[in-house]
C-alpha cells in the first residue's frame, strides 16, 4: 500500500525524536546553525533514532555552515529556506521551504517543495501537483487532513515537533489521531 510520505520538522528534543521514529515517519528535520550545540543535538538524535531519514534544516546560504552540515552531520536530506544555496550539494534529497512564497519558483530537478496548505485555498490546485515532489504543511486537524486525503491527495505531509509538557513528557493524543488517519 502506498501512503503519503511524512516529514516532521523542527525536532528539538529526544521525546519527539523517539516518538516520531517509533510511529514510522519517513523524515525528521532539525535546525543546524552556527551554534555548536545544534550539531551536538543532531548527533544525539542520530544515535538515538533508527529507521527514519534525517534532514538538516538550514535557514541561511552561509557556505561555511552548509559545508559543516554536509561534512559533520552527514544528513540524508537538506531543507533550504532559499533556493540559491543548493548548487553543488552532494547526492542527497533536497527540500525547499516555499511556505513564504507563491510556489512558482524554479527548483533543481528531483527536489521536493514544501508548501503551505490552507482549507480555504482551492484544493484542486494541490491535487494537480506532482505527489513525489510536494509536501504540504499546515496546522493540521483530523477533519482538515481527512478532507484532503479523501479528495485524493497523494503527496507528502509535514508536521512540526512541539514543546515538552515536562522533560521527557508530551501529550501525543492529537498527533496519534493524525498519524493514524494518514497510515490507515
Question: Across the structure, where does each feature detected by a protein language model lie?
Answer:
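Conserved N-terminal beta1-alpha1 strand-loop-helix module at the mouth
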Residues: 1-85, 120-157, 161-184
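Phosphate-end processing signature that detects enzymes handling 5′-triphosphorylated RNA
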Residues: 90-98
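Internal catalytic-core helix/loop-beta-alpha segment
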Residues: 97-126
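Ordered hydrophobic segments in well-structured contexts
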Residues: 95, 113-114, 135, 158
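Structural motif
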Residues: 77, 93, 111-112, 133
Amino acid at each position: 500500500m502506498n501512503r503519503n510520505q511524512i516529514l516532521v520538522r523542527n525536532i528539538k528534543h529526544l521525546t519527539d525524536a523517539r516518538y516520531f521514529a517509533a510511529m514510522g515517519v519517513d523524515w525528521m528535520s532539525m535546525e543546524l546553525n552556527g551554534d555548536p550545540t545544534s550539531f551536538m543535538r543532531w548527533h544525539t538524535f542520530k544515535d538515538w533514532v533508527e529507521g527514519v531519514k534525517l534532514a538538516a534544516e538550514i535557514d541561511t546560504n552561509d557556505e561555511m555552515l552548509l559545508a559543516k552540515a554536509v561534512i559533520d552531520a552527514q544528513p540524508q536530506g537538506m531543507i533550504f529556506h532559499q533556493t540559491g544555496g543548493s548548487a553543488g550539494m552532494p547526492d542527497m534529497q533536497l527540500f525547499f521551504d516555499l511556505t513564504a512564497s507563491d510556489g512558482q519558483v524554479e527548483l533543481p530537478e528531483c527536489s521536493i517543495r514544501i508548501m503551505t496548505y490552507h482549507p480555504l485555498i482551492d484544493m484542486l490546485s494541490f491535487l494537480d501537483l506532482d505527489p513525489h515532489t510536494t509536501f504540504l504543511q499546515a496546522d493540521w486537524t483530523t477533519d482538515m487532513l481527512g478532507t484532503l486525503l479523501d479528495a485524493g491527495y497523494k503527496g507528502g505531509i509535514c508536521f512540526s515537533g512541539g514543546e515538552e509538557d515536562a522533560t521527557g513528557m508530551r501529550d501525543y493524543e492529537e498527533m496519534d489521531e493524525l498519524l493514524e488517519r494518514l497510515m490507515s
